[in-house]
Regions:
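Short acidic/polar hinge/loop motifs at secondary-structure boundaries
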Residues: 4, 12-39
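N-terminal periplasmic accessory domains that precede
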Residues: 8, 22-25, 37, 49-72, ...
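Extracellular loop and loop/strand-boundary signature of outer-membrane beta-barrel proteins
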Residues: 19, 72-73, 111-116, 159-170, ...
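Outer-membrane beta-barrel pore domains and translocons
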Residues: 40, 58, 72-78, 102-104, ...
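Hydrophobic, lipid-facing positions within transmembrane beta-strands of outer-membrane proteins
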Residues: 53, 67-69, 82-86, 95, ...
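Periplasmic-side early beta-strands and strand-to-turn transitions of outer-membrane beta-barrels
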Residues: 56, 66, 72, 87-173
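Residue-level signature of outer-membrane beta-barrel architecture
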Residues: 89-92, 132, 184-186, 231, ...
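Repeated loop/turn-to-beta-strand initiation elements of outer-membrane beta-barrel proteins
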Residues: 94-97, 137-140, 187-194, 204
Length: 241
């Protein structure tokens, strides 16, 4: 059940308006270091939202070298689109940093039957991470990221039968986030770990649905919903040990 599966980024919840099943990820795969999955009884520690399990996305941090950079450029012939990414980071005298950015723009997908309408999309993102090890026991840092997309979808039946036309248009789906953390390790013989997290997050989405339904043998009635605009902003502070 996607409504009962909790999605986290670096242990912090992704907010989502319940206009569709589950929560949108809204993160570039290039920013992901690994993904942890928690199933079974342990997931109930995260609350009722996690009865189906927990997916925790761990983002990239700076490498162990003082400086490291990489980039990529890819061409997608099916959608005549480009995707570019760049990232850099490192560690120097207790300072750990990582920056990355990406941009994609793709047209409609080409299939043996022609171009599939409503499959074009655009996406841009950027993130920055910075932390400092004050000593072997205490670390503090921050992360800021933004993800902005423009996506569409349509049913193939539209190409075969105009009476079943359908599409969804999401010209704006954006997530902005700023997070702070402080963590202590091996503070004494009784307290091995203490962590504080605080973050501000905003999810902004515009969405429009269009469907044409046949009413009788010859009549087709189009139904176009107005643009639904929703904003969800939250501030969370949490202390764990």
């Amino acid at each position: 059940d996607t409504f009962r599966t909790l999605t986290l980024i670096d242990g912090q919840k992704i907010s989502e308006q319940k206009s569709m099943s589950g929560a949108s990820i809204l993160i570039d795969p290039n920013s992901i270091e690994r993904i942890e999955v928690i199933k079974g009884p342990a997931s109930v520690l995260y609350g009722s939202d996690a009865l189906g399990g927990v997916v925790n996305i761990i983002t990239k941090k700076g490498s162990k070298k003082p400086f490291e950079a990489e980039g990529s450029v890819a061409w997608n012939g099916a959608g005549h689109g480009w995707a570019e990414t760049i990232s850099l980071g490192g560690t120097y005298k207790g300072l750990n940093y990582h920056l990355d950015a990406g941009y994609q723009s793709h047209g409609n997908i080409k299939t043996p039957l022609g171009y599939q309408k409503g499959t074009d999309f655009r996406q841009k993102n950027a993130s920055a991470f910075l932390s400092y090890d004050f000593n072997e026991h205490f670390t503090a840092g921050l992360r800021a990221d933004t993800f902005d997309s423009d996506i569409n979808s349509s049913s193939w039946e539209y190409e075969q039968d105009p009476n079943s036309e359908f599409f969804v248009r999401i010209p704006k789906w954006k997530r902005d986030k700023v997070a702070l953390f402080a963590e202590g390790k091996n503070l004494n013989e009784y307290l091995t770990r203490l962590r504080w997290d605080g973050y501000w997050q905003k999810n902004h989405k515009n969405m429009r649905n269009y469907v044409s339904q046949p009413q009788g043998p010859m009549k087709v009635v189009p139904i176009l919903t107005p643009i639904t605009e929703s904003n969800l902003t939250e501030q969370v502070f949490r202390l764990t040990g």
